[in-house]
UniProtKB/Swiss-Prot annotation:
Record GO biological process: L-histidine biosynthetic process
Domain of life: Bacteria
Protein name, entry field: Histidinol-phosphate aminotransferase 1
Oligomeric and partner information: Homodimer.
NCBIfam families in the cross-refs: hisC
InterPro entries, alphabetized: Aminotransferase_I/II_large, HisP_aminotrans, PyrdxlP-dep_Trfase, PyrdxlP-dep_Trfase_major, PyrdxlP-dep_Trfase_small
N6-(pyridoxal phosphate)lysine modification, residue list: K232
HAMAP family: HisC_aminotrans_2
Record organism: Ralstonia nicotianae (strain ATCC BAA-1114 / GMI1000)
Higher taxonomy: Bacteria, Pseudomonadati, Pseudomonadota, Betaproteobacteria, Burkholderiales
GO MF: histidinol-phosphate transaminase activity; pyridoxal phosphate binding
Length: 374
């Protein structure tokens, strides 16, 4: 062995030399094992497609040319989405591998030196994460104690930080509430006026359960994008998101979009299901009715606060979120403990609204777990 040979650095040293410090300090997104559980942690639609449609979809997918790349523009699917989802005339659409990819594309396109992304908090974690990974500053503006939007604080933050991008989730995740429409309108107008000049992205991932939308108002605001996903409608497994807005915004985002980001199976599945959107709409209506039933039942439990929800999940405040979460796990019910995400969410759990059978199992387990409180 040559004594003068350079010492080979350890793998940890090599990682430290190459990987960014902030990335090394991060933790990977953890998805818990839900095998054998009543799974109420991820805001999924509990319903399958009807058997007849599943058979027809299987035949459609069998005809897909898996040996060919997707058509990069996906013009046919975009035209179908515009028609079914009532995208206003004159607006254009961009597709993404889920909304997460679209959020990343917005961050890439807006990542000028010193640029800022602003959003109410607590909110969807990907707004901050995508900003951090692209080198943008993220500014979170706390909601009020009742989890409503703080218009004055938002306007002050917009004036101070001059954000490139403002995210407004409608309904908000993880709180589930719809922000006041007058507050939203005021922020939209301020973002294109004397306060700042910003792109505003309204995230409508849960729109099927809210039945309120900013999509019809796209023609009023040339700085507004409306982002949605098909995940919450019952297609979480195919990972398809879309964003609508002025064609000039869509053209800029399209420049940073990978050319084959939506695979052929996703495209074919979405096109098929959009021809049967009435089935998904009926499922959403059932879940809205179940949401009301859950709210009534949970509100009757001692020490439980149920926050208003226009989504397919409920945010609950309980005396001991960590303990109740563990007791639910022992009863094979998985919910989301969000109590450490933000101080405003202290002792809060987030629960997906499911079908009547799973909701009944959850309510039984919840009541029993409350009674087990030490």
């Amino acid at each position: 062995m040559n004594a003068n040979a350079p010492v080979q650095p350890s793998l940890d040293d090599l990682l430290g030399r190459i990987v960014r410090d902030d990335v090394r300090a991060m933790g990977a997104y953890h998805v818990p094992d839900a095998s054998g559980m009543v799974k109420l942690d991820a805001m999924e639609n509990p319903y399958h497609l009807p058997a007849m449609l599943r058979d027809a979809l299987g035949k459609r997918l069998a005809e897909v040319a898996l040996n060919r790349y997707p058509v990069p523009t996906a013009d046919a699917l975009k035209a179908q989405l515009k028609r079914v989802m009532r995208v206003p005339a004159g607006a254009d659409v961009l597709l993404g591998n889920g909304s997460d990819e679209i959020i990343s594309l917005i961050a890439i396109a807006a990542a000028k030196p010193g640029a800022t992304v602003l959003a109410p908090v607590p909110g969807f974690v990907m707004y901050a994460m995508s900003a951090q990974l692209m080198g943008l500053k993220f500014v979170g503006v706390p909601l009020r104690a009742d989890l409503t939007l703080d218009r004055e604080a938002m306007l002050a933050a917009m004036a101070e930080h001059q954000p490139a991008v403002i995210y407004l989730a409608y309904p908000n995740n993880p709180t589930g509430n719809l922000f006041d429409a007058a507050d939203m309108d005021a922020l939209l107008r301020a973002a294109r006026g004397p306060v700042c000049q910003s792109l505003v992205v309204v995230d409508e991932a849960y729109q099927p359960f809210a039945q309120h939308s900013w999509m019809p108002r796209l023609p009023e605001f040339d700085h507004l994008l409306v982002m949605r996903t098909v995940s919450k409608l019952g297609l979480a497994g195919i990972r398809l998101g879309y964003v609508a807005g002025h064609p000039k915004w869509i053209a800029e985002l399209d420049k940073v979009r990978p050319p084959y980001n939506v695979n052929v199976l996703t495209e074919a599945t979405a096109a098929f299901v959009l021809d049967h959107v009435d089935v998904l709409d009926a499922q959403a209506a059932t879940l809205r009715a179940e949401r009301t039933r859950l709210i009534d039942a949970l509100s009757a439990q001692p020490g439980v606060t149920v926050f208003p929800s226009a989504a397919n999940f409920l945010l609950l405040r309980v005396p001991d979120a960590a303990g109740l979460f563990e007791r639910l796990l022992k009863r094979r019910v998985l919910v989301k403990n969000v109590s450490k995400m933000h101080p405003l969410l202290a002792n809060c759990l987030r629960v997906t609204v499911s079908n009547p059978e799973e909701n009944a199992q959850f309510l039984d387990a919840f009541a029993a777990s409350l009674q087990d409180t030490p």
